[in-house]
Amino acid sequence: MTQRKIIHIDCDCFYAAIEMRDEPDLAGKPLAVGGSAERRGVIATCNYEARAYGVRSAMSSRHALKLCPDLTIVKPRMDAYKEASREIHTIFRDYTDLIEPLSLDEAFLDVSEAGHFSGSATRIAQDIRRRVSNQLHITVSAGVAPNKFLAKIASDWKKPNGLFVITPDQVEEFVASLPVTKLHGVGKVTADKLGRLGIVDCADLRSRSKLALVREFGSFGERLWSLAHGIDDRPVQNDSRRQSVSVENTYDTDLPDLAACLEKLPDLLETLSGRMARMEGQYRPGKPFVKVKFHDFTQTTLEQSGAGRDLGSYEQLLAQAFARGGKPVRLLGIGVRLHDLRAAHEQLELFSRQ
């Protein structure tokens, strides 16, 4: 059996990072994203400067301001966060299609079969971190391990902006010293019960038989036994029904005008055509679209029903999109909306059985 290679990517204070990127004056100061104190708002996330004062997610904004009177609280901009998340996932898909999103800022990747960097999951994680930093100007932390349980723990090990790797031969020793509170599914109630039994870390858990743990905790006891031995067979479960396929590039030097943008289209279209070819028979291509992000991080996306997917069609779309901003461009993307042929086939099978 092939040894699995799982990466867990977790953006560092994601919402706050996007706000500091888009408003540089906020950087280096205590910042939170959430509702206003006057309206009994709650903190969604905060940067590390705010955390130093004890500010935390899910805390009331009023209490956060008591802890940190200089705290700046900004309203969430979900569209901006979703767009950044989409850009990150576009990077992920250059390495694998086995992606399990946990939230906008967090995902598992199974790179067991990836051919990049001779199959090195560590180098893939390094490259993802580099590209996210260069393209989005935010940082992510990454954990690399043989399973999801350990990869998630590893990503938190050197936060923020860190990478931690647990190789298969390190699993046994690493897990033995883990506090039981680090185990997936162990909350305060279970941790307290384990503590009363004299079980503080995974070494203590290993001293108990699987049967004894099942007697104490029911079916979850078996899960506890497995985790204490570093075992987690849960697969990375991706939503395989894709809405679109796209390719985009962030340029080292801003493209100054439309002509410079148009010069980049053939290379983008060649890459897109290759990705489309790999999906033949699974999806029917629909509307083409272009995405333009200008040098000031404003952006626009334009799609058109009935348009072709040839170079000329993308040139027309790009010209219209560029006209919306008329400024130097830092990122260009092109893509196609998709219709899932597999879903349609499943519907036909369903009706044929009735």
UniProtKB/Swiss-Prot annotation:
Protein name: DNA polymerase IV
Subunit structure: Monomer.
Annotated disulfide bonds: none
EC assignment: 2.7.7.7
GO biological process entries: DNA-templated DNA replication; error-prone translesion synthesis; SOS response
Transmembrane segments: none
Annotated PANTHER family: DNA POLYMERASE KAPPA, DNA REPAIR POLYMERASE UMUC / TRANSFERASE FAMILY MEMBER
Gene name for this UniProt entry: dinB
Function: Poorly processive, error-prone DNA polymerase involved in untargeted mutagenesis. Copies undamaged DNA at stalled replication forks, which arise in vivo from mismatched or misaligned primer ends. These misaligned primers can be extended by PolIV. Exhibits no 3'-5' exonuclease (proofreading) activity. May be involved in translesional synthesis, in conjunction with the beta clamp from PolIII.
Gene Ontology CC: cytosol
Residue numbers marked as site, Substrate discrimination: Y15
Catalytic activities: DNA(n) + a 2'-deoxyribonucleoside 5'-triphosphate = DNA(n+1) + diphosphate
Alphabetized UniProt keyword annotations: Cytoplasm, DNA damage, DNA repair, DNA replication, DNA-binding, DNA-directed DNA polymerase, Magnesium, Metal-binding, Mutator protein, Nucleotidyltransferase, Transferase
Organism listed in the record: Pseudomonas syringae pv. syringae (strain B728a)
InterPro entries: DNA/RNA_pol_sf, DNA_pol_Y-fam_lit_finger_sf, DNA_pol_Y-fam_little_finger, DNA_polymerase-Y, DNApol_IV, PolY_HhH_motif, Rev_trsase/Diguanyl_cyclase, UmuC
Domain of life (superkingdom): Bacteria
Cofactors required: Mg(2+)
Family in the record: Belongs to the DNA polymerase type-Y family.
UniProt GO MF annotations: damaged DNA binding; DNA-directed DNA polymerase activity; magnesium ion binding
